[in-house]
Amino acid sequence: YAAAIEDANTNNTKEKTLLVNRPVENTPVEASDLAVAVHGSGTDLCILSYGNGYYLSRQAEKELAEKGIECRVVDLRWLAPLDESGIIEQAQACKKVLIVDECRKTGSISEAIMTLLYENATNSANAVQRLCAHDSFIPLGSAAYHVLPSKEDIVNIASEMCLTNTKAESKA
């Protein structure tokens, strides 16, 4: 949306099905402000996400705080082009990074973000994990919850990453 305003071009918009009919904040988008949106200032964990993954990450943020994990949730806001400098800046400010992506693990935007972080951020390789949907068709209705990331998945992986020394396994 913001890029369409900036370029004054017609663009196709994809909307996450699980976000339909969810309340949203009505904040005006300035064409000159196309940076990532950062919520929180914790340094234990940076959660990078967008769409419904962002919504679930904000829910998980509350449970993680109860476990003593201070995190920040970064809303990517748009995927092309990525705000690479904003992503790197937020990742470097934290000890660990979790990328939450509702797309399938293979070929998702999380691959580009992982590459960006490995090439440019100072976090060690085991400090960056991703949580993605299974490599399968995404079913409709309640069956979708068997293959898509959930708030519980985010809390579990984030807890493993921050409270233990073992490398968390991503879903899929």
Where do the language-model regions lie?
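Basic phosphate/pyrophosphate-binding loop/patch that engages nucleotide-derived ligands
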Residues: 6-7
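Thiamine diphosphate
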Residues: 2, 11-12, 16-172
